[in-house]
Each structure stands twice: as C-alpha cells, then as structure tokens.
C-alpha cells in the first residue's frame, strides 16, 4: 500500500513538472498587432440655444448657440454648418480652438452666433450641425433643429 502511494505521488509530481516545463504561448494578440491607435474622439456634452427658452427663432435675427465640449487630445477647430429647409448644407463658420474652460459644466464652452436668414417662411426648419475636430483628425458631430416662427 505504501508502495502504491509513493508511486502515485511520484507520478503526480512528474506530471506537474512536465506541465510546468511546457512553453506557455501568449494570448492571441491579433487586435494589438493589427490596429493603430491614433487618439481619442472629442466629446460634445451639449449644443443648445442660449438663452435656452425655445428653438423657435425669428427670420432675420441672430441666435446664440451654446456648445459645451471637451477632449483628451488637442482640439484643432470647430465647424458650424446649417441646412435651411430642403437646401444644401452650408458652412456658417470655422472657429480655431481657444481654451474656455467652464468650472460649472467642467467643459470648454463656446458661443457661436448664427444669423438666421431673412425672408424665410414661418415653419421653415433649420438644422444646425456642429463638428469638433481634433488635431489627430478624429471628429464628433451633433445637430440642433430650429424652426422659424
């Protein structure tokens, strides 16, 4: 009986030694080997009309659009575009990044003026699109719908 126990113990230790001597392969690193990380995407925390009473606007007036955004990577510029009714999208402004950190919202803030075209019919929809562009070329877009009253 003692001989069997010693034999089993010896086999157990020998098996453990064989398994620990085997080469351990790294986990599959396909993703790491085949993806180039170029940076992080900017974040748009909010895009609203200021003061925030309504999205109904008068033709011929100027509307202040409040953009709240941030990014872990350096920001290059902010593009503002508009689509009036069924027309083509047009660039309203391109603004170079200027640091404007807000302690209240913990984001950068930017007020973008938008002159609403005069002579628009009541009920015309205006879609505003803002795009934050990082220096690493990654972008984030969001839209805001306005209605002519």
What are these regions (language model features)?
Residues 1-4, 19-20, 79, 87-90:
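Compositionally biased, low-complexity segments enriched in small residues
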Residues 2-6, 15-44:
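Bacterial Sec-dependent N-terminal signal peptides
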Residues 8, 17-19, 82, 118:
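Functionally constrained cores in energy, signaling, and assembly domains
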Residues 31-149:
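First exposed extracellular module after export/assembly in secreted or surface-exposed proteins
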């Amino acid at each position: 009986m003692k001989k069997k126990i010693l034999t089993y113990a010896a086999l157990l230790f020998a098996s453990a030694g064989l398994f620990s001597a085997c080469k351990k392969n790294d986990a599959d690193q396909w993703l790491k080997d085949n993806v180039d990380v170029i940076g992080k995407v900017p974040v748009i925390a909010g895009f609203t009309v200021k003061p925030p009473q309504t999205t109904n606007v008068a033709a011929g007036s100027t509307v202040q659009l409040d953009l709240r955004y941030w990014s872990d990577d350096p920001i290059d510029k902010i593009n503002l575009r508009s689509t009036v009714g069924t027309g083509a999208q047009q660039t309203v402004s391109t603004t170079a990044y200027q640091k404007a950190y807000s302690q209240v919202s913990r984001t950068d803030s930017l007020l973008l003026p938008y002159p609403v075209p005069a002579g628009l019919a009541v009920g015309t929809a205006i879609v505003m699109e803002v795009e934050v562009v990082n220096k690493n070329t990654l972008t984030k877009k969001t839209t805001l719908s306005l209605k002519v009253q």
